């Protein structure tokens, strides 16, 4: 799956593979972490 890191720039900082992960799939995993942090 091709992901657009431009939509979620914070992914690059939170997830090492943010560039390869899909923003839809990553948002679900990263969002809860960002709310706590």
UniProtKB/Swiss-Prot annotation:
GO molecular function, one term: toxin activity
Expression across tissues: Expressed by the venom gland.
Keyword presence, Disulfide bond: yes
Record organism: Hemachatus haemachatus
Protein name, entry field: Hemextin A
Matches recorded under SUPFAM superfamilies: Snake toxin-like (SSF57302)
Sorted UniProt keywords: Blood coagulation cascade inhibiting toxin, Disulfide bond, Hemostasis impairing toxin, Secreted, Toxin
Subcellular location: Secreted
Assembly and interaction partners: Heterotetramer composed of two A and two B chains; non-covalently linked. Does not exist as a complex in the crude venom.
Keyword Secreted belongs to the record: yes
Cystine pairs: none
Family: Belongs to the three-finger toxin family. Short-chain subfamily. Type IB cytotoxin sub-subfamily.
Pfam families linked: Toxin_cobra-type (PF21947)
Gene Ontology annotations for the cellular component aspect, listed alphabetically: extracellular region
Highest taxon above the source species: Eukaryota
Modifications made to the protein after synthesis: May contain several disulfide bonds.
InterPro entries: Cytotoxin_Cobra, Snake_toxin-like_sf, Toxin_cobra-type
Entry function: Hemextin A (monomer): exhibits mild anticoagulant activity. It specifically inhibits the activation of FX (F10) by the TF-FVIIa complex (extrinsic tenase complex (ETC)) by non-competitively inhibiting the enzymatic activity of FVIIa.
């Amino acid at each position: 799956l091709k992901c657009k890191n431009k939509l979620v720039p914070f992914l690059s900082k939170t997830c090492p593979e943010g560039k390869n992960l899909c923003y839809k799939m990553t948002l679900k995993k990263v969002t809860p972490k960002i709310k706590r942090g």
